[in-house]
């Protein structure tokens, strides 16, 4: 299973900001590291997020909720989640509107990890 590096996510954030507008910069590098590492957390030697879909949901939720960046947390959260799924050869059948709604719902506190996982499974091909 792949693991996106902090450096890769920082580059993606910069590219997204250049393409769509907004500020570039990390507000708290520890929150970014926490969001990226959470998907691979273990307890008693057991992975907390065992499947690729669970890891993707954790990445999306943590990146959006942690607000590690000054701007673009929703965009980077959904982009990293979808990039992870694509890298793991999990195809999604969702529209841009579906993705925007997901990001906004998570940021507003209306979707948590479990709902994101359901969303992934709903739109998975």
State the predicted function of each range.
Residues 1-125:
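FIC/Doc superfamily catalytic core
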């Amino acid at each position: 299973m792949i693991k996106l590096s902090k450096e890769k996510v920082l580059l993606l954030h910069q590219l997204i900001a250049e393409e769509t507008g907004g500020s570039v910069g990390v507000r708290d590098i520890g929150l970014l590291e926490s969001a990226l590492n959470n998907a691979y957390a273990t307890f008693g030697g057991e992975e907390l997020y065992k499947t690729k879909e669970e890891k993707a949901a954790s990445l999306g939720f943590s990146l959006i909720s942690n607000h590690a960046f000054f701007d673009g947390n929703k965009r980077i959260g959904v982009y990293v989640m979808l990039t992870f799924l694509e890298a793991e050869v999990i195809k999604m059948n969702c529209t841009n509107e579906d993705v925007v709604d997901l990001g906004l719902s998570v940021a507003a506190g209306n979707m948590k990890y479990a709902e994101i996982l359901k969303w992934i499974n709903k739109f998975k091909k």
